[in-house]
């Protein structure tokens, strides 16, 4: 039988069993090593209200607290939510992370190689 992935879609080497976690989106039980994990940092207040809060605040330099979330998705929710994409057979062999899209102050896309040239 043909193997689709070298690691069988999980990060379990030499362990017999891994404790399941619950998907952040649908609460499905998924092995911890198979789940797609993303760590996000967000402001607790939306960006439109930050200026209003800072104007109304008594303190001069008040920083709005941030939310630190570890999101863990099952494979189907990660694909549906476009956190990961289905890749071709050759694409599955590529272990490098996808290139990150960066924006400059004007809101235009900048590739890391362009940023190094201009600096």
UniProtKB/Swiss-Prot annotation:
Keywords, in A-Z order: Cytoplasm, Ribonucleoprotein, Ribosomal protein
Molecular function via GO: mRNA binding; structural constituent of ribosome
Chief location: cytoplasm
Subunit structure: Component of the small ribosomal subunit (SSU). Mature N.crassa ribosomes consist of a small (40S) and a large (60S) subunit. The 40S small subunit contains 1 molecule of ribosomal RNA (18S rRNA) and at least 32 different proteins. The large 60S subunit contains 3 rRNA molecules (26S, 5.8S and 5S rRNA) and at least 42 different proteins.
Job of this protein: Component of the ribosome, a large ribonucleoprotein complex responsible for the synthesis of proteins in the cell. The small ribosomal subunit (SSU) binds messenger RNAs (mRNAs) and translates the encoded message by selecting cognate aminoacyl-transfer RNA (tRNA) molecules. The large subunit (LSU) contains the ribosomal catalytic site termed the peptidyl transferase center (PTC), which catalyzes the formation of peptide bonds, thereby polymerizing the amino acids delivered by tRNAs into a polypeptide chain.
Keyword Ribonucleoprotein among UniProt keywords: yes
Cellular-component GO terms for this entry: cytosolic small ribosomal subunit
Family per record: Belongs to the eukaryotic ribosomal protein eS26 family.
Entry coiled-coil feature ranges: none
Name the record gives this protein: Small ribosomal subunit protein eS26
Organism of derivation: Neurospora crassa (strain ATCC 24698 / 74-OR23-1A / CBS 708.71 / DSM 1257 / FGSC 987)
GO biological process, one term: translation
Recorded superkingdom: Eukaryota
Disordered: annotated span: 1-20, 88-119
Subcellular location as annotated: Cytoplasm
Alphabetical list of InterPro entries matching this protein: Ribosomal_eS26, Ribosomal_eS26_CS, Ribosomal_eS26_sf
Keyword Ribonucleoprotein on entry: yes
């Amino acid at each position: 039988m043909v193997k689709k992935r070298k690691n069988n879609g999980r990060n379990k080497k030499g362990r017999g069993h891994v404790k399941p976690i619950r998907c952040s989106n649908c609460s499905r039980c998924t092995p911890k090593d198979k789940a797609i994990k993303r760590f996000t940092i967000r402001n607790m207040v939306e960006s439109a209200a930050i200026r209003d809060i800072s104007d109304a605040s008594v303190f001069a330099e008040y920083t709005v607290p941030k939310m630190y979330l570890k999101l863990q998705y099952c494979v189907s929710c990660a694909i549906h939510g476009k956190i990961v994409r289905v890749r071709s057979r050759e694409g599955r062999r590529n272990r490098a992370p996808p290139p990150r899209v960066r924006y400059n102050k004007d809101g235009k896309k900048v590739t890391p190689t362009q940023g190094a040239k201009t600096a």
